[in-house]
């Protein structure tokens, strides 16, 4: 026991005499963690605000520079660059260095490439670069501008990790790389995320800052529009852009560039540019996942047609889906649209600092001033040293005989140098230069060259001294340098900035506001077609096939409206349903369309009898008329909250159905026509307004087997158009029709014969509209009413459309020429001048 105790005492004595100290564990953890955190912040994760580079990026570029891998030299194996960098400057894993170098060679990662890569350096699909032994690389031409004049003492150098090499603490950076290429990184307790910008815009911003140091953030926003990402895409201008310009923090909304193309059988969404840092393969997988989960149901097929020419992702749209609405769903559910968080944190004088746009530009500008001053000082010293030597050489040349004699008499160089100093006042440097001078330099020609060089050096010395003394001249030189960079490397924006678009996407934000024709068949198939799809034909023309129908189906409704209009569907059961016009999928003249039951909750035995487009529910009335002549007037405001599930619009007797609904102003004359060729005319205000659920009053007195065939107003025209079932029609002035009371028999307007057939349409027009007629076979003929001459009452009219045997006229629609051509805007009238009348 005593022996063991002696050993313990001995160990305690040795420990007491050693350098081991007793310290607090919590204090040591705090100190060590702070050292680690600062190491990560300063030496790994955050870029320097001056050159925009992290240490590993700087070391890769400088390693390639010292290895002679310039842009005008042959490519070298990537493994050679990685090996040089790892052995001299960055003693970490080779894959970390290679990944860094590869990223600087990827045009989808960096806005302005710093490495010119040769071989497979990865793809936007997430493919990794080929092994470094297979790929080759060199500095890009633009990277040379980052390193320009680095050999002129423009930046500080420090010893590398083993003290055998010197590496720069920052690069001269002749262009603002921090903002041009951006940066991202996660440190301890902080992170940075800086978007790339357009180099030309940045240089314009720097020139603005030089010319006007007091410029505001708004001034900078005038020239630097916002981020400009390597992959292009669209940027939605939001307050987030203004925020990071002002504070250094914000969000940028990036939206894929997508067009809608019409394939032979269906529409397709074609994606040609995707947001920055979005993996294309992962994007496709996410879309497929959503389709399988039935979260998105409008996609028929998706395929990747990308090539060397660029991205092309084709998403085929199902026929019953509106492409714009599907695109909106994809923007909301996938990375076709992303938010890029901006946190402009960078190292300023070795410490992390959050910079706004002006501060970032100012830090770079100060760095350029420092680089210019140091380069000028370096050049000045070099010029002065050379000037000093030339002065000695010229003294010797002018006294060459005496100089030669002194040299010949001298025992050695030291004696000769002392003699030259005593005789001509030459210092050691000048005397040594004289001794090193070759005999051929003594010729008159060479002496003249020395004198010329001395004069040039004198001018350069004076210029350098002027630069060092004049800050405005320094700024002027920087402007000239930036202008040259812009001329050589400036390029157009890749990312288009969209103004006036809400960040919160609504379906209609993506739908073009334009005039369309909405058609519906007897069996309830709806279709949306562009107005220009129909050919204007001369009176009596045969027409074009307007709609392919099933064997027992034919066209019953047609309406011209805006894609942003409300569509109100009035049914023969007296109900009304509402959707937006763009919810009807676009189609072709020859396809069948989409069943109305897919869009509105209509009963199987319910038939749509009127379509009306509305944008404003504040003014006007709906005027109803049933097939048996019952009428009702109701304010538009009572229909403002109609849904697709429908509401009651009118009540009527059990043996009746709703024939038509029109819009009125409250001051119109109402015209109601019958199949027997009679028309009744009365003042609208003789019918008092009733609620939606009310039953109306009689408007026309009909005989048995007679039905209403037309409902229109005096504000819709000064002529009355009457068209028979066999395509015979005519125009008559409404002045020929006297006012009557409602529920009158009316006056004769068209003489009904076997040639005319029953009257299918009676409506008011101005006479300068276009007339669209649809036959039972689906033919559409479009003529101008200006081709028809005015006729008297009770005449038969002229042929308007050629019909085959057993073919009859089903639908007649009137619309204004101008509004059928131009795109409807939000400020235009609700109805686009359209009137539809059905038998």
Swiss-Prot record:
Entry-linked InterPro entries: GyrA, GyrA/parC_rep, Gyrase/topoIV_suA_C, Topo_IIA-like_dom_sf, Topo_IIA_A/C_ab, Topo_IIA_A_a_sf, Topo_IIA_dom_A, Type_II_DNA_Topoisomerases
Domain of life: Bacteria
Record's keyword terms, sorted: ATP-binding, Cytoplasm, DNA-binding, Isomerase, Nucleotide-binding, Topoisomerase
Keyword NAD: no
Catalytic activity of the protein: ATP-dependent breakage, passage and rejoining of double-stranded DNA
One Pfam family linked to the record: DNA_gyraseA_C
Predominant subcellular localization, coarse grouping: cytoplasm
Domain Topo IIA-type catalytic: 46-510
Keyword field contains Disulfide bond: no
The enzyme's E.C. designation: 5.6.2.2
Gene Ontology molecular function: ATP binding; DNA binding; DNA negative supercoiling activity
Signal peptide segment: none
GO cellular component, as recorded: chromosome; cytoplasm; DNA topoisomerase type II (double strand cut, ATP-hydrolyzing) complex
EC class name: isomerase
Active site positions, chain numbering: 134
Additional free-text comment from the UniProt record: Few gyrases are as efficient as E.coli at forming negative supercoils. Not all organisms have 2 type II topoisomerases; in organisms with a single type II topoisomerase this enzyme also has to decatenate newly replicated chromosomes.
Family annotation (NCBIfam families): gyrA, PRK05560.1, PRK05561.1
Family membership noted in the UniProt record: Belongs to the type II topoisomerase GyrA/ParC subunit family.
Known function: A type II topoisomerase that negatively supercoils closed circular double-stranded (ds) DNA in an ATP-dependent manner to modulate DNA topology and maintain chromosomes in an underwound state. Negative supercoiling favors strand separation, and DNA replication, transcription, recombination and repair, all of which involve strand separation. Also able to catalyze the interconversion of other topological isomers of dsDNA rings, including catenanes and knotted rings. Type II topoisomerases break and join 2 DNA strands simultaneously in an ATP-dependent manner.
Protein name per Swiss-Prot or TrEMBL: DNA gyrase subunit A
Name of the gene encoding the protein in the UniProt record: gyrA
């Amino acid at each position: 026991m005593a022996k063991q105790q002696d050993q313990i005492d001995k160990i305690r004595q040795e420990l007491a005499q050693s350098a081991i100290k007793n310290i607090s564990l919590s204090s040591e953890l705090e100190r060590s963690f702070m050292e680690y955190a600062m190491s990560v912040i300063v030496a790994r994760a955050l870029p320097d605000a001056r050159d925009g580079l992290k240490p590993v990026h700087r070391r890769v570029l400088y390693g390639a520079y010292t290895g002679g891998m310039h842009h005008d030299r042959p490519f070298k194996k990537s493994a050679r660059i990685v090996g040089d960098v790892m052995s001299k400057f960055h003693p970490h894993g080779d894959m970390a260095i290679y990944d860094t170098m590869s990223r600087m060679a990827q045009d989808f990662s960096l806005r302005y490439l710093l490495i010119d890569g040769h071989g497979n350096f990865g793809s936007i699909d997430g493919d990794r670069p080929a092994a470094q032994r297979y790929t080759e690389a060199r500095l890009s031409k633009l990277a040379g501008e980052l390193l320009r004049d680095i050999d002129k003492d423009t930046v500080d150098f420090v010893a590398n990790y083993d003290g055998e090499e010197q590496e720069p603490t920052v690069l001269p950076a002749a262009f603002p790389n921090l903002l041009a290429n951006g940066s991202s990184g996660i440190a301890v307790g902080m992170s940075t995320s800086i978007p790339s910008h357009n180099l030309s815009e940045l240089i314009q911003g720097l020139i603005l800052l030089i010319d006007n140091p007091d410029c505001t953030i708004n001034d900078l926003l005038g020239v630097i529009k916002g981020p400009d990402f390597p992959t292009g895409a669209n940027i939605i201008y939001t307050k987030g852009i203004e925020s990071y310009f002002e504070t250094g923090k914000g969000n940028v909304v990036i939206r894929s560039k997508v067009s809608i193309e019409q394939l032979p059988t269906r529409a397709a969404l074609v994606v040609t540019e995707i947001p920055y840092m979005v993996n294309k393969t992962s994007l496709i997988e996410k879309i497929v996942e959503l389709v399988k989960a039935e979260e998105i149901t409008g996609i028929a097929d998706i395929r990747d047609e990308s090539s060397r020419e660029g991205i092309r992702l084709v998403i085929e749209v199902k026929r019953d889906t509106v492409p714009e609405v599907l695109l909106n769903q994809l923007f909301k559910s996938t990375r076709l649209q992303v938010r890029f968080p901006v946190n402009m944190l960078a190292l300023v004088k070795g410490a992390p600092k959050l910079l706004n746009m002006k501060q970032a530009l100012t830090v770079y500008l100060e760095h350029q001033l420092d680089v210019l001053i140091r380069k000028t000082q370096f050049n000045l010293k070099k010029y002065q040293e050379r000037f000093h030597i030339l002065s000695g050489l010229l003294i010797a040349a002018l006294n060459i005989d005496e100089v030669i004699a002194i040299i010949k008499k001298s025992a050695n160089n030291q004696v000769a140098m002392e003699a030259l100093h005593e005789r001509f006042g030459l210092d050691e440097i000048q005397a040594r230069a004289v001794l090193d001078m070759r005999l051929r330099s003594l010729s008159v020609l060479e002496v003249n060259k020395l004198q010329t060089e001395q004069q040039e050096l004198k001018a350069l010395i004076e210029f350098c001294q002027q630069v060092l003394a004049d800050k405005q001249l320094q700024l002027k030189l920087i402007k000239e340098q930036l202008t040259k960079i812009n001329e050589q490397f400036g390029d157009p924006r890749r990312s288009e900035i969209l103004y006036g678009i809400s960040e919160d996407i609504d379906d209609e934000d993506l739908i073009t506001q334009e005039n369309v024709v909405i058609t519906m068949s007897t069996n309830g198939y709806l279709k949306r077609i562009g107005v220009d799809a129909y050919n204007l034909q001369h009176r009596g023309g045969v027409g074009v096939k307007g709609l392919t129908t099933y064997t027992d189906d034919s066209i019953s409704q047609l309406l011209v409206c805006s894609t942003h209009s409300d569509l109100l569907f009035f049914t023969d059961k007296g109900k009304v349903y509402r959707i937006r016009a763009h919810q009807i999928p676009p189609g072709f003249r020859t396809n069948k369309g989409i069943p109305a039951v897919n869009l509105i909750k209509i009963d199987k035995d319910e038939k749509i009898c009127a379509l009306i487009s509305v944008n404003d529910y504040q003014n006007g009335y709906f005027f109803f008329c049933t097939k048996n002549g019952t009428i009702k007037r109701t304010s538009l405001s009572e229909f403002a909250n109609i849904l697709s599930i429908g509401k009651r619009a009118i009540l009527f007797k059990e043996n009746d159905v709703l024939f038509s609904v029109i819009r009125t102003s409250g001051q119109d004359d109402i015209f109601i026509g019958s199949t027997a060729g009679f028309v009744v005319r009365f003042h609208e205000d003789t019918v008092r307004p009733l609620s939606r659920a009310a039953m109306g009053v009689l408007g026309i007195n009909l005989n048995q087997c007679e039905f209403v065939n037309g409902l229109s107003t005096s504000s819709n025209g000064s002529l009355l158009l009457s068209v028979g079932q066999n395509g015979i029609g005519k125009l008559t002035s409404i002045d020929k029709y006297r006012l009557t009371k409602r529920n009158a028999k009316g006056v004769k307007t068209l003489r009904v014969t076997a040639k005319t057939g029953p009257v299918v349409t009676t409506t008011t027009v101005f006479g300068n509209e276009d007339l669209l007629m649809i036959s039972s076979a689906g033919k559409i003929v479009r003529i101008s009413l200006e081709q028809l001459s005015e006729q008297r009452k009770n005449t038969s009219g002229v042929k308007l459309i050629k019909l085959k045997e057993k073919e009859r006229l089903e639908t007649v629609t009137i619309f204004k020429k101008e509004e059928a051509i131009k795109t409807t805007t939000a400020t235009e009238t609700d109805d686009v001048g359209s009137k539809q009348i059905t038998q």
